[in-house]
Curated annotation (Swiss-Prot):
Composition skew (Polar residues), residue ranges: 701-719
Disulfide topology: none
Chief localisation class: endoplasmic reticulum
Protein name per the record: Flavin carrier protein 1
Annotated organism of origin: Saccharomyces cerevisiae (strain ATCC 204508 / S288c)
Transmembrane annotation, as ranges: 164-184, 195-215, 224-244, 250-272, 318-338, 373-393, 398-418, 462-482, 485-505, 517-537, 552-572
Position of the signal peptide: 1-21
Glycosylated residue positions: N143, N281
Stated role: May be responsible for the transport of FAD into the endoplasmic reticulum lumen, where it is required for oxidative protein folding.
Region (Disordered): 649-674, 689-731
GO biological process terms held by the UniProt record: FAD transport; fungal-type cell wall biogenesis; protein folding; sphingolipid biosynthetic process; transmembrane transport
Residues in the Lumenal compartment per record: 22-163, 216-223, 273-317, 394-397, 483-484, 538-551
Molecular-function GO terms, alphabetical: FAD transmembrane transporter activity
Highest taxon of source: Eukaryota
Amino acid sequence: MQVLVTLWCLICTCLVLPVAAKKRTLTASSLVTCMENSQLSANSFDVSFSPDDRSLHYDLDMTTQIDSYIYAYVDVYAYGFKIITENFDVCSMGWKQFCPVHPGNIQIDSIEYIAQKYVKMIPGIAYQVPDIDAYVRLNIYNNVSENLACIQVFFSNGKTVSQIGVKWVTAVIAGIGLLTSAVLSTFGNSTAASHISANTMSLFLYFQSVAVVAMQHVDSVPPIAAAWSENLAWSMGLIRITFMQKIFRWYVEATGGSASLYLTATTMSVLTQRGLDYLKNTSVYKRAENVLYGNSNTLIFRGIKRMGYRMKIENTAIVCTGFTFFVLCGYFLAGFIMACKYSIELCIRCGWMRSDRFYQFRKNWRSVLKGSLLRYIYIGFTQLTILSFWEFTERDSAGVIVIACLFIVLSCGLMAWAAYRTIFFASKSVEMYNNPAALLYGDEYVLNKYGFFYTMFNAKHYWWNALLTTYILVKALFVGFAQASGKTQALAIFIIDLAYFVAIIRYKPYLDRPTNIVNIFICTVTLVNSFLFMFFSNLFNQKYAVSAIMGWVFFIMNAAFSLLLLLMILAFTTIILFSKNPDSRFKPAKDDRASFQKHAIPHEGALNKSVANELMALGNVAKDHTENWEYELKSQEGKSEDNLFGVEYDDEKTGTNSENAESSSKETTRPTFSEKVLRSLSIKRNKSKLGSFKRSAPDKITQQEVSPDRASSSPNSKSYPGVSHTRQESEANNGLINAYEDEQFSLMEPSILEDAASSTQMHAMPARDLSLSSVANAQDVTKKANILDPDYL
C-alpha cells in the first residue's frame, strides 16, 4: 500500500508541477445568452483576469439593441453554489463605452483594474483547482427595471486533468499488455497468455466505456468529468495529427461535403462544457430551467462533437480520424507479424537460430495472422460501430458515408461469423466428445483463428462473447443514432449496463475467479458512470450543484480505478518477463482446456534418428504390457505368497474368473515409497554388475548354443527401426528378457567365470532379474520374478 501511495504522489506531482508554475489567471472565451430574445449577444468574447495586478483585459465584439442606461446584476457560481452577488451601475464604474448603450456593434479592446475588495471576494482555491466549474451570470436592466438581456460567461484557470502524459501512459501500458499476451501465445504459454489477454481486453473495454459514456449528448457535463474522459479518447481513435486534418478536410470537400473550420475561425465562439443547443420552434420554457442559447456566432457543442472539439478535431474530420487510425494500426499489426515470421526464417537459414525454434509459429503463422486481425477488429468494434452510425446522421460527405457502410459490414459481419464458428465448433465438440473444450482448444486452427472469441471465458461459457458484442452493439446504436436526445441516451444506456451487470454476476463467465472479480468491478464502475450521466442529462431536474459534485465523484472514482488496473497489468507483465515458467505464476482455468491443448514440439529433423528408433522401440515394448503393469507387480507378490504349490501367478491368472476379478481390483493400488526405493536400488545395482562384467572380459564373447526350451518362437514378434533381429516371446510376457538371446551372443563361460562354483552361482540365481543388465546371465526360467522381495538382493 505504501508503494501505491508513493507512486500516486509522484504521478500527481509530475502532472501538477508544470502547471503550478504558471501565473494565476482566470480566462473566459465564450459568452452565451441565458434568456430568449436577449438584446445583447456576443460575436467574439475574450476576457482574462490576473489577481496579482488586479488587471482585467477584455476584447469584445458585441451586438445590442439596447438604447438606455443599464444596471447589471452579477451572480458568481462555483460548482452550482452562488458565492458572490453584486448590483452596480455601469456608469458609476467609469466604463464610458457602456454609459449609455446605443444600438449597434460594440467593439472594445481595453484593460480595467478591479478594486481590491472585489479581488478578495474570489477564493484562492479558484486559481489552483483543475477544471474549475465557475461561471458568471449578468442580468441587465434599464432604469425602469425591465430585463433587457441575460448573458453567461464560463471561466477557466488554465489547469486541467487532461494531460498528454496520462494519455500516453494509459495507451502504452495497455499496448504492453496486448503485446505480452501475443508473445506468450507464440511461445505456447497458454495459461499466462489467457490471463493477461483477458485482463488487458477488459482494460481496453473499460477505457472505451468511459469514452462512450462521455459521448452522450447530455445537458451539462461538469468540466472535470469531461476533461478526464479526454484522456481516454485515444481508445476511440480520436488522435489529432495536424497534417492528417488537412488531408481529411480535402477528402470531405473532394467527395461532395463541406468541411467545417470551427478551430480556425476568428469570429466564432464555441462552448463545449455545458448547455442546451438552441431549440427552434420552441417558445415556452419553465421559469427555473437553465437554458442557454447559441447564435450564428456562438455554437454549443455537446456529445461526440464536444469530445472532438476538445481533442482539436473538426466535426467533419471526427469519423475520418477514427477510421484512419484503425486502418493504420491494423496494417502495422499485420506487417509486424509478417516481419517476425520472415525474420525468423532468415535467421534459421543463416544459421543464427536452431531450426526447431518457433516451429509452431512458423507452421501456423497464417492462422495466427488471421486470429490477430480478428482480435484487433474485436478491440475496435465499439469505435467502428459508433462512428459509422453517427456518420449516417451527420452525412459529412458521400465518400465518408460509403466508408462507414463498409466498416459496419466488416465489423458486424466478422464478429457474427466468429460467434457462429465458435458456437458451431463447440456444439460439434459436445456432440462428439461431450465437452466443448475438445475442439475449441484441441484444434490448433480453431484456437489460433477464433481463440480471441472464447479464451477469456470458461469453456462452459464459450458463447459469452456473442452476448458481449451484442451488448456493445446495442449501446453503439443509442450513442450513434440518438445524439438529438441526451435523456434518451442516458436512460437507455443505464438500463443496458444494469442488465449486463446482473448477467455477469449471475453467470461469472470468465476463466477464473480473480478475472471474474476484476470484470465485475469494471461493470460496477461502468454502471455507476451511466448512473451519474443520468444526472448530467438533467433527467431528474435537480440543481446543478448535484451534477457538479457528481462530476468530482466521476473523476476520483475513474482515476483511482484506472490506476489500479494499469498497475495490475504492469505487475502481470513484470512477473511474466522475470519468470522462467510464466504458466506457474497463474492458476489454471477452472476447466480442462489444458488437457486438450497441444504444446510446442521440436521439428522432425531436429531429432536424432537413433534416438527416434530407441523411442519407437520403447513404445512398442510398452504396448506388450497391460495397463498399470508396474502396479501389478505388488499384486503378483501377494498372490504368490498365498500359492502353496509354488505355481507362478502369470499361469494362474488365466485360470478362473474370480482370480481375474481380484487382479483387476488390485490394479488401482500403488506401490509404497519404500517399495519404489527398493526397486530403483535394485536396478542401479544390476547396472553396476553389468558394467563390471563387461570391463572384465570385453573380447571373450563368442557364440553359444541356446537351450531349446528357452528359445521358443513367438508368434507376435515385432520389428524395430534399426534392429535386424526378431524378438521372441518371453516367459514373463514383458518383452524384455529373451529377445537378446537371438542376437547370437556366445559367452565363453570358462574364460569368464573363475570356477564351477562361481559359474553355478551365477547361472542359478535364487530370483529372476527383470532388468536389462541381466542379458549376459543365464537364468532359471522356473523361478518367480520378484524384485520387491526383501531377500532379492
